[in-house]
């Protein structure tokens, strides 16, 4: 596990983009993408670059259940606004936030991941150590599944909604096994609120109580973080 300390998210985005260029030069075809504020500067680097992504495939980590892709709070909308509209991919897959038939969607998305092995997976990390929407207690052998969101996750994401009652309580997420199946992983972490989770991820015991600690079992993980997020290491 490699840890790179950066001044801020802008520098973090640039560092990650250099890693991406190296992976693309070595033949990477499929990117695993994340939402939230942590990867935004990385996506800006992609958008502003002259690289052609029209032959690449992307698969996203997760999506809220109950939000249509046209909903501004959905992760599909986020990806369209921040990346896909400006830099089209050949194919872009996200879980569908369908309420009525989540089990079928889980099966569909697991098949998509089987058909499109991820070369480089982008991650953020939750204050409780979640990656994707894999909350504490998620088995390390889990694949795509329906998640009941932890209250701390709902509270952390409430800033994106008019009120906390509007935050969905379920999501469909890649499982930890899906994430670990990626050839390479970049995890972004910024701010003091992530320090405890990062300390456990890097140097704590590998435990299902801290989902990100599973990354210690992966051969090619790069953590890009600021001083605050690294303050407990």
UniProtKB/Swiss-Prot annotation:
Q: Please give the superkingdom of this protein's source.
A: Bacteria
Q: Which GO terms describe its biological process?
A: carbohydrate metabolic process; glucosamine catabolic process; N-acetylglucosamine catabolic process; N-acetylneuraminate catabolic process
Catalytic activity entry: alpha-D-glucosamine 6-phosphate + H2O = beta-D-fructose 6-phosphate + NH4(+)
InterPro entries assigned: Glc/Gal-6P_isomerase, Glucosamine6P_isomerase, Glucosamine6P_isomerase_CS, NagB/RpiA_transferase-like
Keywords recorded for this protein, A-Z: Carbohydrate metabolism, Hydrolase
Whether Hydrolase counts among this entry's keywords is yes
EC no. given is: 3.5.99.6
Active-site positions on this chain: 62, 128, 130, 135
Q: In which pathway does it act?
A: Amino-sugar metabolism; N-acetylneuraminate degradation; D-fructose 6-phosphate from N-acetylneuraminate: step 5/5
Q: Which GO terms describe its cellular component?
A: cytoplasm
Q: Top EC class per UniProt? A: hydrolase
Molecular-function GO term, any one: glucosamine-6-phosphate deaminase activity
What's this chain's function? Catalyzes the reversible isomerization-deamination of glucosamine 6-phosphate (GlcN6P) to form fructose 6-phosphate (Fru6P) and ammonium ion.
Q: Which family does it belong to?
A: Belongs to the glucosamine/galactosamine-6-phosphate isomerase family. NagB subfamily.
Q: What is this protein called?
A: Glucosamine-6-phosphate deaminase
- What is this protein's gene name? nagB
């Amino acid at each position: 596990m490699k840890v790179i300390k950066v001044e801020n998210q802008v520098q973090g985005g640039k560092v990650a983009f250099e890693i991406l260029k190296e992976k693309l030069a070595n033949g990477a075809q499929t990117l695993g993408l994340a939402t939230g504020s942590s990867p935004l500067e990385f996506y800006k680097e992609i958008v502003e670059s002259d690289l052609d992504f029209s032959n690449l495939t992307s698969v996203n980590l997760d999506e809220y259940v109950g939000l249509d892709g046209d909903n501004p709070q959905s992760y599909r909308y986020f990806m369209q606004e921040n990346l896909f509209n400006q830099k089209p991919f050949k194919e872009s897959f996200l879980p569908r936030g369908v309420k009525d038939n989540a089990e079928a969607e889980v099966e569909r998305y697991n098949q998509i991941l089987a058909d499109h092995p991820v070369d480089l997976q982008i991650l953020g990390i939750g204050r409780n150590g979640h990656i994707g929407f894999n909350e504490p207690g998620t088995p390390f052998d889990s694949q795509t599944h329906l998640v009941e969101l932890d209250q701390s996750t709902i509270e952390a994401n409430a800033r994106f909604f008019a009120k906390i009652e509007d935050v969905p309580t379920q999501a469909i997420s890649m499982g930890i096994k899906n994430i670990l199946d990626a050839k390479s992983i970049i995890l972004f972490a910024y701010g003091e609120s992530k320090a405890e989770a990062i300390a456990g991820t890097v140097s704590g015991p590998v435990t299902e109580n801290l989902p990100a600690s599973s990354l210690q079992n992966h051969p090619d993980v790069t953590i890009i973080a600021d001083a605050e997020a690294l303050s407990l290491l």
